[in-house]
């Protein structure tokens, strides 16, 4: 039991630094939406090439998340984040200067690898550096940073497009191309700035004490824990817990995964990662403009709706960050997913008969925003917290990679299937299916996921055995 003071300024600092990786994740994922048409026009892309441009980063992400656990457990959490920052920097700058479509795709894939690595390592690192009382909100900083990255990308796209339309620049210089005639270069290249900042500030944070203990570097681990806890007794208590967790019989990670209790939690993690993608949130974020158009909102500004959705997403994530350690992970899922089901049923009903009944499309937009609110306050935040908490230290990196890979596979599948579902099942059937997929998610969390609020990682490891 920790009884003394905690240096929360220091803990918050290292958490914010790691969360910058989430900002890059969000920006890199969302910025593509503002560049599709201009890139397709400049390089004369056909439909297949256009789809490849949109999806190529996902290929890199799947590879990155596949190796992230091994990287994190072999070279450490800190150096893995440094690697991801380098990849983001190379990708952003390379995209800005690409002369051919092949070069552009190659650099997008490089950035995708960075996304995959950081999506596993950043929340894992924050979880291992946090204190039990505040771990939920600290890990939630990562999801908040993703939403800020989304919003930042939408706003950067809008600003550069407006700047391009003012036609203030003329000539053929590189600056003119980046911020004027070929503004997509500026949209993609702007990521270089936060990527370089991320790379530099990582050097001011320590390695995870749990990883250091795993590598038998106890003196270094003690120094890190000593900066978190001011009481010497608390330092010893924390180190004893970590030592007991990692000092048991040495096995390979894959052999450790064969244990029944560990295998069960890995399956649960995979299930909530995949199911979370089939509850519609990424379909709404990715295909929102076309869905809004089908609803009768085509006369409005699609970019405005995008920024509106991004704003609600970000502000709700801030609320979730403030309450997750008070309300608990499972209650947020119950309330949030319950609200998602209601919202999805209302959306399906609108597409089935709302237009016939003369219901205003603004009502649909309101329900969409309510749906985003329910997602952001529950599954979008809770999934990263749970995945960073629910595995033993010795397999945490590998297990998070498996769950993260499942999440990215789910993202890929929903991205590919959504257009087909919208055309085959119609919007009404598609959103009804999303509502149905919420049911097994909430049942899995209810029956198989323990409440981890206020528990140390070592205490969580005990109750999941």
Region spans (language model):
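Alpha-helical transmembrane bundle of multi-pass membrane proteins
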Residues: 1-220, 224-226, 246-465
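Short, well-structured alpha-helical segments
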Residues: 232-244
């Amino acid at each position: 039991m920790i009884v003394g003071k905690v240096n929360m300024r220091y803990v918050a600092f290292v958490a914010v630094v790691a969360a910058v990786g989430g900002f890059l994740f969000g920006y890199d994922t969302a910025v593509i939406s503002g560049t599709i048409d201009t890139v397709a026009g400049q390089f004369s892309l056909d439909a297949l090439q256009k789809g490849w441009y949109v999806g190529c980063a996902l290929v890199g992400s799947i590879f990155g998340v596949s190796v992230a656990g091994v990287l994190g457990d072999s070279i450490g959490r800190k150096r893995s984040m440094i690697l991801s920052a380098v990849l983001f920097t190379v990708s952003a700058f390379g995209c800005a200067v690409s002369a051919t479509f092949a070069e552009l795709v190659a650099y997008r894939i490089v950035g995708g690898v960075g996304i995959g690595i950081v999506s596993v390592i950043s929340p894992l690192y924050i979880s291992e550096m946090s204190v039990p009382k505040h771990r939920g909100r600290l890990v939630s900083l990562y999801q908040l940073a993703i939403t800020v990255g989304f919003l930042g990308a939408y706003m950067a796209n809008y600003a550069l497009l407006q700047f391009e339309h003012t036609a203030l620049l003329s000539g053929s210089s590189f600056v003119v191309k980046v911020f004027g005639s070929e503004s997509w270069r500026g949209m993609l290249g702007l990521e270089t700035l936060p990527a370089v900042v991320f790379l530099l500030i990582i050097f001011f944070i320590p390695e995870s004490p749990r990883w250091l203990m795993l590598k038998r570097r106890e003196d270094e681990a003690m120094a890190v824990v000593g900066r978190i806890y001011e009481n010497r007794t608390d330092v010893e208590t924390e180190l004893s817990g970590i030592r007991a967790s990692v000092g048991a019989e040495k096995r390979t990670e894959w052999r450790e995964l064969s244990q029944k209790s560990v295998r069960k939690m890995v399956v649960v993690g995979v299930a909530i990662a995949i199911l979370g993608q089939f509850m519609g949130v990424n379909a709404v974020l990715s295909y929102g403009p076309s869905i809004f158009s089908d609803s009768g909102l085509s006369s409005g500004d699609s970019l405005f709706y995008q920024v509106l959705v991004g704003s609600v997403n970000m502000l709700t994530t801030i609320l979730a960050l403030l309450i997750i350690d008070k309300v608990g992970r499972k209650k947020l899922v119950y309330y949030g997913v319950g609200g998602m089901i209601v919202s999805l049923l209302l959306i399906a009903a609108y597409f089935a008969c709302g237009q016939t009944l003369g219901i205003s499309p603004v009502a649909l937009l309101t329900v969409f925003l309510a749906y985003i609110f329910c997602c952001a306050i529950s599954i979008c935040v809770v999934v990263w917290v749970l995945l960073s908490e629910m595995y033993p230290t010795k397999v945490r990196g590998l297990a998070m990679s498996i769950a993260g890979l499942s999440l990215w596979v789910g993202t890929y599948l929903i991205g590919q299937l959504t257009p087909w579902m919208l055309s085959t099942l119609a919007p009404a059937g598609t959103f009804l299916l999303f509502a149905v997929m919420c049911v097994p998610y909430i049942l899995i969390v209810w029956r198989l996921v323990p409440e981890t609020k206020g528990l140390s990682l070592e205490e969580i490891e005990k109750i999941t055995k």
